Amino acid sequence: IVYDGHEDQPTIEGTKFYKRNGYYYIMSPAGGVKYGWQVELRSKNPYGPYEEYVGMAQGKNKKVNGPHQGAWVDTQNGEDWFLHFQDKHAYGRVVHLQPAKWVNDWLVIGDDKDGDGCGDPVQQWKKPNLPSSGNFQPKESDDFNSVDLGLQWQWNGPYSQYWYFCDAKNSKLRLYGVQQAEDVKNLYDVPNLLLQKLPTENFTATAKVKFIPNRTEAYKENDKVLGESAGMIMQGMDYAALKF
């Protein structure tokens, strides 16, 4: 053990190890996912002893909680930046790119407006001085005019190629009903849910859905199939669905 954070820096995890200007650095998140901060440890010897420093914390920024768990990166133009995530509960974990600068061989991350040596996360900043690669917008909508699913889609569990068919000729996606295991108690355990990450906290989703039950004699009761359903879902540990 080269550093024990139980007293002052609890929940040390996700560490990165660097060497710069003769110092060895261990950069780690501390304090837990929702309300933590970014800790920096440095020493001339990789086995310590280590000095400790807080390079970024939530501070007065009430919209970016727990800014930590990331990595220092530098550009070919000599700029320093820090990538980290923010936990936003049901919305997931979003990625931030924070400006950074070295002060007395400590990395101050974000904007240190009050001059205390600890940066606060920013929500807007001048982009890195790098060659332009054009505008990039992750795909959200899909007309299903390809024989493959777009990268914006993901399954709720390990998938099978027999669950779907991309009908590019007619711009349609066909999903097949899948018999679930007997011990499945709710949709959280169902693997064949086709999902996307939420694009933003407030959005509208529309889809044209045609439900064609598998009308076989073995599963037909009063002209309805037992157990089959389809529709749209807001999926998570809690979920809500509009379904047939």
Segments predicted by a language model, with ranges:
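Short consensus segments that form the blades of beta-propeller domains
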Residues: 30-33, 88-91, 221-222
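Repeat-solenoid scaffold signature
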Residues: 59-103
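Structural motif
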Residues: 34-42, 91-98
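Extracellular glycan-recognition regions
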Residues: 98, 105-244
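Blade-edge beta-strand/turn elements of extracellular beta-propeller
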Residues: 1-10, 40-63, 108-113, 135-142, ...
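Hydrophobic core segments of beta-strands in well-ordered, beta-rich domains
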Residues: 13-31, 78-86, 144
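A short, structured loop/turn motif at beta-sheet edges
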Residues: 21, 42-48, 75-77, 104-106
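Beta-rich, blade/repeat-based domains predominating
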Residues: 7-22, 63-77
